Amino acid sequence: MTQDDPENAWPITLAALTTGLNRPSSRFRMRQYITRLAEHGVNVQEHIPFIEKTCYFPGPLKAIRHIPGLFRSRNADLVWLSRSFVKGYETFERFLKRPRILDVDDAVWLGRPLGRFAVPDIARSMDAVIAGNTYLAEYFGSYCNKVYVVPTAIDLDRYKLCSQALMESREEFVIGWTGTASNYKYLKNIESVLARFLREHSQAEFMLVSDRCWEYDLLPPEKVRFVMWDREKEVSALHSMSVGIMPLADDKWTRGKCSFKMLQYMSAGLPVIASPVGMNREVLQKGDIGFAADSPDEWYEALTTLYGDRSLQIKFGQAGRKVVEQFYNADTIAGELADIFKAQLSG
């Protein structure tokens, strides 16, 4: 389909090939835009493998599960692929209708078998790549002529700002962390700092929101609260926190992360403490939103400063919310995505 007159030829139909309903890469990079894109003349038809509509399915059927979506996508004007399509080996990518666009929010060439060999070939077979940050864009720019940087955005209609009254009335100082259990290794790097802080501050506690408990070694158990992740309660869980933390190692994999934990905390009006790695550093530079912490002493100092200053917590939290509204708002990002999709048909 060629759009000779872009102003009058829309709407267009976009086939979105995604994965399980709770997979973050599908939820926040693609699915949350379906309604918003329709407002910009892009009608999205999402194709979720039947076997993954409620759960993630590992194993050898990873490639075969996408075949029905591949055939159904032939009726669309263009195809939008979740990064879950990148397995570290080529499967059906070359058989998809063109234009085809790959969305990536992780350094997928590092975490897959044979990824550093196959991912470049997959990227070359794409007409465009949408990357979650500049680090990813630089990599894919070596293999695809059209690469766009589009950050993972926040649905501000859903992620409400925690009320100032609640922040001011809370007696406990709740250090919050949310994420999948696979990322507990980054918490391990600051476990000794957390343990010391929790023991030395009577009103402090640590709140974990995840899919599985963390088997920590040093934390005082009476100061740790585990909350099983629940899609319907993920926002209210943020409102129970005083500060959100995002510790990371500094390596090629973490530089590909898109700072989504930080953005979730900020959308709720929480101050943040984060390792200044990759996109985290970029987000920290956009406002007076919290602290960068690069050593045990810096983590301890940041926690201590916020613990003793409720007004600073609120100040940082409000500034963080404004940064999200300005730079990471799903309503705004939807317009950027629509322009990208239309450009593939009008060029």
PLM regions and their residue ranges:
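Nucleotide-sugar-dependent
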Residues: 185, 231-237, 242-267, 274-282
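Conserved catalytic-core segment of nucleotide-activated headgroup transferases in glycan assembly
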Residues: 21-36, 40, 156-158, 168-240
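Membrane-proximal helix-turn-helix segments that form the acceptor-binding/catalytic region
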Residues: 66-74, 89-95, 106-129
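Carbohydrate-associated surface elements
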Residues: 135, 153
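Conserved acidic donor-binding segment of nucleotide-sugar-dependent glycosyltransferases
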Residues: 286-297, 305-311
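A short, well-ordered alpha-helix in the C-terminal region of glycosyltransferases
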Residues: 305, 312-326, 333, 339
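Acidic anion/phosphate-binding donor-loop and adjacent secondary structure
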Residues: 2, 110, 154-172
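C-terminal alpha-helical cap of glycosyltransferases
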Residues: 4, 330-347
